């Protein structure tokens, strides 16, 4: 890619969208496909120098992103079109740059973030889908989305999420602050929309797994509050599948003035 190299160092933020179904998660790892590795390779081609990216949230194998944010530093002076159209031309079809923004030195994709937002998409129908099969989680028993929504409201605010935390979670604390959790139905789709300052490992998928039990009338509405109070992962339901989970937005202080495109996923109304 033609362009100038300079003695100055530029810090660039990008919005990234990806279908995680064919990747072993976000994080670069030896001998397996990762979103980070593909993005760094494409950026390095455009920058004509090695690029390392830092992301807002490392998603697991099979999990998707419509609102992932990354930053990197480079001495390459390029037009915005090079960092969007140029990088996209070098990326696989299931990863895309959505926007680019030059950011100040004190910006960090992970540490400057004030909140993350996820959406979990359930295809609630007797028969499984074929199109979008890796972009939704199929659940065949009828679900009561309003019941799920009511049950979930006990999770609001600052709580100990041990009951919804993966055993292998490496976070120093199970405490997180949930800002909203909404469960809504859109035809055959049931959407769990949750925003928090941060998430413990598998937190969204573990919450959804238990909400499915409530929605199917296998557990009472009070069960989620009981699980939260118990602080015991073994009492909660199985972890919901990765396919339905999307990182849809990351919040930053207004002073960074980052773009805010529609959250998606694109087959859902915003």
UniProtKB/Swiss-Prot annotation:
Pfam family, any one: PseudoU_synth_1
Keywords associated with the record: Isomerase, tRNA processing
GO biological processes: tRNA pseudouridine synthesis
CDD domains, A to Z: PseudoU_synth_EcTruA
Single GO MF descriptor: tRNA pseudouridine(38-40) synthase activity
Entry keyword annotation includes Isomerase: yes
Annotated EC: 5.4.99.12
UniProt: substrate binding residues: 118
Class of enzymatic activity (EC top level): isomerase
Active site: 60 (nucleophile)
Catalytic reactions on record: uridine(38/39/40) in tRNA = pseudouridine(38/39/40) in tRNA
Free-text function comment from the UniProt entry: Formation of pseudouridine at positions 38, 39 and 40 in the anticodon stem and loop of transfer RNAs.
NCBIfam families found in the cross-reference section: hisT_truA
Family membership noted in the UniProt record: Belongs to the tRNA pseudouridine synthase TruA family.
HAMAP family: TruA (MF_00171)
Oligomer status and interactors: Homodimer.
Stated name of the protein: tRNA pseudouridine synthase A
Originating organism: Salmonella typhimurium (strain LT2 / SGSC1412 / ATCC 700720)
Gene coding for it: truA
């Amino acid at each position: 890619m033609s362009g100038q190299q300079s003695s100055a160092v530029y810090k660039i933020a990008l919005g990234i969208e990806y279908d995680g179904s064919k990747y072993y998660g976000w994080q670069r790892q030896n001998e397996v496909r990762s979103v980070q590795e593909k993005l760094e390779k494409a950026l390095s081609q455009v920058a004509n120098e090695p690029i390392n990216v830092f992301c807002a949230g490392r998603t697991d194998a099979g999990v998707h992103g419509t609102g992932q944010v990354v930053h990197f530093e480079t001495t390459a002076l390029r037009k915005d079109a090079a960092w969007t159209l140029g990088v996209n031309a070098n990326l696989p079809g299931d990863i895309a740059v959505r926007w680019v923004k030059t950011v100040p030195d004190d910006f960090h994709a992970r540490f400057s973030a004030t909140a993350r937002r996820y959406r979990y998409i359930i295809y609630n129908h007797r028969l499984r889908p074929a199109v979008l099969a890796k972009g939704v989680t199929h659940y065949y028993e009828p679900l009561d989305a309003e019941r799920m929504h009511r049950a979930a409201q006990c999770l609001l605010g600052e709580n100990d999420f041990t009951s919804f935390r993966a055993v292998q979670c490496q976070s120093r604390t199970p405490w997180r602050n949930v800002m909203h959790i909404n469960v809504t139905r859109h035809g055959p789709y049931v959407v769990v929309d949750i925003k928090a300052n941060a998430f413990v490992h598998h937190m969204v998928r573990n919450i959804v797994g238990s909400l499915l039990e409530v929605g199917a009338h296998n557990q009472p509405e009070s069960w989620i509050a009981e699980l939260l109070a118990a602080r015991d992962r073994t009492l909660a339901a199985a972890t919901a599948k990765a396919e339905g989970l999307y990182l849809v937005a990351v919040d930053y202080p207004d002073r960074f003035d980052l773009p805010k495109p529609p959250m998606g996923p694109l087959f859902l109304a915003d």
